[in-house]
Amino acid sequence: MEQPAPKSKLKKLSEDSLTKQPEEVFDVLEKLGEGSYGSVFKAIHKESGQVVAIKQVPVESDLQEIIKEISIMQQCDSHYVVKYYGSYFKNTDLWIVMEYCGAGSVSDIIRLRNKTLTEDEIATILRSTLKGLEYLHFMRKIHRDIKAGNILLNTEGHAKLADFGVAGQLTDTMAKRNTVIGTPFWMAPEVIQEIGYNCVADIWSLGITSIEMAEGKPPYADIHPMRAIFMIPTNPPPTFRKPELWTDEFTDFVKKCLVKNPEQRATATQLLQHPFIKNAKPVSILRDLITEAMDIKAKRHEELQRELEEEDENSEEDELDSHTMVKTNSESAGTMRAASTMSEGAQTMIEHNSTMLESDLGTMVINSDDEEEEEEEDGTMKRNATSPQGPRPSFMDYFDKQDSKNKPHDNCNQNLHEQYHISKNVFPDNWKVPPDGDFDFLKNLSFEELQMRLKALDPMMEREIEDLRQRYNAKRQPILDAMDAKKRRQQNF
């Protein structure tokens, strides 16, 4: 008798399934993209026929952080949090089996459609997201990396929180954290300042995510991330670039999220009672945009396959003609990119590089093959420090990646390096900030001298940031080398 596809969801993998090789339990269908620490694949659970997501993590990655992610997912049982089914060790990879969300992340949908979201769509997504945060915070857990790339949608439109690679749990002995972790543009001021933080740090990130969904990118996305880190704690809370495009309810919701004093910031439970969320429409309003995004993805996949087949045929012809193999750069040639267009208001077009920015900062990007190749070349699988000093700031991976991308183009960037070295020499020592913080001497300078100092301020700060980054890497590299040496010794036993 033919077994019908089960209506009940897969709750957990059986003990029998966990003793088998993962290939016996699952059929892996396709690669979905890159998440924190590893690649994510779509697969089918053979016994039940249920589609799942499998994150394959190299064991060289930071196992402590991966185990933390699994531990957090195991403890969660909510419709608004991605479910965990079990895990396997296979050769040098850890396979983490999770709930599959067929529509991908909110940032994927924005990128594929090349459109920002409407207020109604944002409100519906935020309602589910807040319910997920309310659950996590009730369990005394902080997500710490809330952004559009970590909010996944299933095909029905239900939003679920994902990617607990940097999530942490509050305990009685450690009620507040003082480690900088997460993605720079979404980070709360108290997180950047390392003055200790709690669950409402996620609420600030949710406010930034609201602006991201409305405008296509977070505030400060156009400036250097290190400069944003300086600006977020000192500047007033960010707002919409064109507030007149949005209703008072939405503007007030974002304002309540982006309160700089965490003690005065609203909680997830309080925000669920906000009129903007209380009046949110059902998830059915998201089905059209999900269908549109999935259709675009399917068409691009077909076009990519067609181009790859044509290139394979051409390479075979070239080989026959010249008796030499001709290598084709199929990945870069076949990857679709959204055109650069406007980025204003609801249902407006956005620049592709504003959403692609997130992929460099840890957001999963569906079928972004060319970026995957770059990540494999420079080996920047997300790593947080495992020493007692606390995790490494995730945003530092962004700078490492930028450095590695720039290495093959040293000649192209020669002028930039020359400008940097020139700028280092044009600032007299007496232009540095006085150690005692006494700026009275400025009163004696002429207007022209004050103008020159003001113009020189940004280059001076860039220089200080570069010096700081180099000192950081100089201290970090010996620690990583020592860790790698210990791992190699352990593998030899």
Curated annotation (Swiss-Prot):
Its cofactor is Mg(2+). Homodimer; mediated via the coiled-coil region. Residues 286-327, 444-477 form a coiled coil. Pfam families: Mst1_SARAH, Pkinase. Residues 308-320, 369-378 have a biased composition (Acidic residues). Residues 398-410 have a biased composition (Basic and acidic residues). CDD domains: SARAH_MST2 (cd21888), STKc_MST1_2 (cd06612). Keywords: Apoptosis, ATP-binding, Coiled coil, Cytoplasm, Kinase, Magnesium, Metal-binding, Nucleotide-binding, Nucleus, Phosphoprotein, Serine/threonine-protein kinase, Transferase. GO terms for cellular component: cytoplasm; nucleus. Stress-activated, pro-apoptotic kinase which, following caspase-cleavage, enters the nucleus and induces chromatin condensation followed by internucleosomal DNA fragmentation. Key component of the Hippo signaling pathway which plays a pivotal role in organ size control and tumor suppression by restricting proliferation and promoting apoptosis. InterPro entries: Kinase-like_dom_sf (IPR011009), Mst1_2_SARAH_domain (IPR024205), Mst2_SARAH (IPR049568), p53_tetramer_sf (IPR036674), Prot_kinase_dom (IPR000719), Protein_kinase_ATP_BS (IPR017441), SARAH_dom (IPR011524), STE20/SPS1-PAK (IPR050629). The keyword DNA-binding does not apply. Residues 439-486 form the SARAH domain. This is Serine/threonine-protein kinase 3. ATP binds at L32, G33, E34, G35, S36, Y37, G38, S39, V40, K55. SMART domains: S_TKc (SM00220).
